[in-house]
From Swiss-Prot:
Record's GO cellular component terms: membrane
Protein's UniProt name: Uncharacterized protein MJ1395
Location(s) in or outside the cell: Membrane
Source organism (scientific name): Methanocaldococcus jannaschii (strain ATCC 43067 / DSM 2661 / JAL-1 / JCM 10045 / NBRC 100440)
Keywords: Membrane, Transmembrane, Transmembrane helix
Membrane-topology annotation of the record: Single-pass membrane protein
Primary subcellular site in the record, as a coarse category: membrane
Domain of life, per lineage: Archaea
Length: 132
């Protein structure tokens, strides 16, 4: 297997080339591990977007995030999905220092909407109490 790394202005491209024929019904397992500074850091939430694509059909794609933070969002959700050839799939994930469960929407949206709702309820409550 040949590995080629090319550096662009703001990113790097890692190319893996398999030069041995793959027999029909057979497959190869390719495990890619790397460290990269691709995380958008916030105060409570961190997001990452990873582009995946190739010149061949990917029939069983699995991604595993190892992080000290809680995984609160992943799109596409789950693992073991397919990626058609010549298609770019972007995997979005969000992590938080807060112990939130995995949600169908970004955790920061739920968090800040909850804070806003609580503030509105407190404001309405204090205004109603003040008028009495």
């Amino acid at each position: 297997m040949d590995v080629n790394v090319s550096y662009k202005d703001t990113y790097s491209v890692i190319t893996y080339q398999v030069w041995e024929p793959i027999d029909g019904g057979k497959n190869i397992t390719l495990i890619i591990e790397y460290d990269a500074d691709i995380v958008d850091n916030g105060i409570l939430f961190k997001t990452v977007s990873i582009p995946i694509g190739g010149d061949l059909n990917i029939k069983n794609f699995h991604i595993n995030f190892v992080s000290p933070y809680y995984l609160t969002y992943q799109e596409p959700d789950g693992n073991n999905f397919q990626i058609p050839k010549k298609t770019l799939l972007i995997i979005n994930a969000e992590f938080s220092i807060l112990p939130l469960p995995k949600l169908p929407v970004h955790g920061y949206v739920v968090f800040w909407l909850s804070i806003l709702c609580i503030l509105i309820i407190i404001f309405v409550y204090t205004e109603l109490r003040r008028k009495k």
